[in-house]
Amino acid sequence: MHQVVCATTNPAKIQAILQAFHEIFGEGSCHIASVAVESGVPEQPFGSEETRAGARNRVANARRLLPEADFWVAIEAGIDGDSTFSWVVIENASQRGEARSATLPLPAVILEKVREGEALGPVMSRYTGIDEIGRKEGAIGVFTAGKLTRASVYHQAVILALSPFHNAVYQAL
């Protein structure tokens, strides 16, 4: 059984990670543990590089905390231009897989508040009345009328980031 450490306590992220690992490695093949670790970047990262650095830092911190695991996974959401997106970073003892999620263009009224220094989650909670929206459907769920959720978009990126761990072509010389 694979021991998987999620570098998050966010239910939407944990759900995406659990579902993806079960789809790739088989139902019941993974034990998931979640830990709260620092990202080393601002609460609301801006740009692809800062956001990816946050995910990489979370993986490194989770590895230090639980070094006996088989996989460490982090999902870091950020703002790039006028859109929200995330980076997924997965590591095992010998390799790393990374994938960037789909992007969601944000309305100007939301972007204005985020650029003023507020994190997207609290801004969205205030506009929608949904407490802790970032731990639920997220801006993605709201702006896609529920057709996608934060977890569903993360799930796809986790599947992509897992590709090097189960596909032999990545191991070819």
Curated annotation (Swiss-Prot):
Positions that bind Mg(2+): 38, 68
Cofactor note: Binds 1 divalent metal cation per subunit; can use either Mg(2+) or Mn(2+).
GO molecular function: ITPase activity; metal ion binding; nucleotide binding; ribonucleoside triphosphate phosphatase activity
Enzyme category, top tier: hydrolase
SUPFAM superfamilies the record matches: ITPase-like (SSF52972)
Gene Ontology annotations of biological process type: nucleotide metabolic process; thiamine metabolic process
Cofactors that this protein relies on: Mg(2+); Mn(2+)
Entry EC no(s): 3.6.1.73
Highest taxon of source: Bacteria
Reaction(s) the record says it catalyses: XTP + H2O = XDP + phosphate + H(+); ITP + H2O = IDP + phosphate + H(+)
Pfam assignment, any one: NTPase_I-T
Complex formation: Homodimer.
Xref: NCBIfam families: inosine/xanthosine triphosphatase (TIGR00258), PRK05074.1 (NF003459)
Function: Phosphatase that hydrolyzes non-canonical purine nucleotides such as XTP and ITP to their respective diphosphate derivatives. Probably excludes non-canonical purines from DNA/RNA precursor pool, thus preventing their incorporation into DNA/RNA and avoiding chromosomal lesions.
Designated name of the protein: Inosine/xanthosine triphosphatase
Taxonomic source organism: Escherichia coli (strain ATCC 8739 / DSM 1576 / NBRC 3972 / NCIMB 8545 / WDCM 00012 / Crooks)
